[in-house]
Amino acid sequence: DHMSHDVYSPRL
């Protein structure tokens, strides 16, 4: 579980 760059949740 690593949220480096939003891959699962893209920042729009």
Swiss-Prot record:
This is Pyrokinin-4. It is found in: Secreted. Mediates visceral muscle contractile activity (myotropic activity). One of its GO terms (cellular component) is extracellular region. GO terms for biological process: neuropeptide signaling pathway. The modification Leucine amide is found at L12. Belongs to the pyrokinin family. Keywords: Amidation, Neuropeptide, Secreted. Expressed in the brain, subesophageal ganglion and in the retrocerebral complex (mainly corpora cardiaca). The lineage of its organism: Eukaryota, Metazoa, Ecdysozoa, Arthropoda, Hexapoda.
